[in-house]
Amino acid sequence: MGKISSLPTQLFKCCFCDFLKVKMHIMSSSHLFYLALCLLTFTSSATAGPETLCGAELVDALQFVCGDRGFYFNKPTGYGSSSRRAPQTGIVDECCFRSCDLRRLEMYCAPLKPAKSARSVRAQRHTDMPKAQKEVHLKNASRGSAGNKNYRM
C-alpha cells in the first residue's frame, strides 16, 4: 500500500505549488537561468567531499595565500598550541592527509617583515655625503692642530 501523507503536508505542498506557478509566470527567463545556476552551485558544493591539497597544489595554494611573505612547511617553534597537536605536525599532515581551510593555510605563512625606515642624515656614512660637503669635511680633517707631528695609533 502507498504511503499516506498527513493533511497539513498535502495542504503545504498544494499551496507551495500554487505559489511557485504564480511566481514562474512573473519570472523572466534570465531570472530562471540564474536561479537554476544557484541551485546547481549549491547542490554540487554540498555533494562534493572534503578536498585535500598535496604536492604542487599545496605549494600553489600557500604561495597564493601567503604572497611575498613566504611560508613554512612546519610551524615555527612556539607557534600555536603544542598541547593539542603532535610536535612534528606540518602542513602536509594537516592539508594533504586531511582537508584544511584557508585559516589553516594562513597559519603556515611567515610573519610580515617590518618596513625599513629611512636612514637619518646622522646615520649616513661620510661617503654618502654630497661631493661639496665631502670636500669640506676632508679639508677640515687635514687641518688638525698636530702640525707636522706623526702620531701612531
Swiss-Prot record:
Propeptide position ranges: 119-153
Pfam family membership, one: Insulin
Disulfide linkage: C54-C96, C66-C109, C95-C100
Protein name per the record: Insulin-like growth factor 1
Subunit structure: Forms a ternary complex with IGFR1 and ITGAV:ITGB3. Forms a ternary complex with IGFR1 and ITGA6:ITGB4. Forms a ternary complex with IGFBP3 and ALS.
Region D, residue ranges: 111-118
Biased composition (Polar residues): 142-153
UniProt KW keywords: Disulfide bond, Growth factor, Secreted, Signal
Residue segments, region Disordered: 120-153
Annotated region described as C, given as residue ranges: 78-89
Compartments it resides in: Secreted
Entry's Gene Ontology cellular component terms: alphav-beta3 integrin-IGF-1-IGF1R complex; exocytic vesicle; extracellular space
Domain of life of the organism encoding this protein: Eukaryota
Underlying gene: IGF1
Spans annotated as A: 90-110
Region B, residue ranges: 49-77
Role played: The insulin-like growth factors, isolated from plasma, are structurally and functionally related to insulin but have a much higher growth-promoting activity. May be a physiological regulator of [1-14C]-2-deoxy-D-glucose (2DG) transport and glycogen synthesis in osteoblasts. Stimulates glucose transport in bone-derived osteoblastic (PyMS) cells and is effective at much lower concentrations than insulin, not only regarding glycogen and DNA synthesis but also with regard to enhancing glucose uptake. May play a role in synapse maturation.
Compositionally skewed regions (Basic and acidic residues) per UniProt: 125-138
InterPro entries: IGF-I, Insulin-like, Insulin-like_growth_factor, Insulin-like_sf, Insulin_CS, Insulin_family
GO biological process, one term: positive regulation of cell population proliferation
Family: Belongs to the insulin family.
Entry GO MF terms: growth factor activity; hormone activity; insulin-like growth factor receptor binding
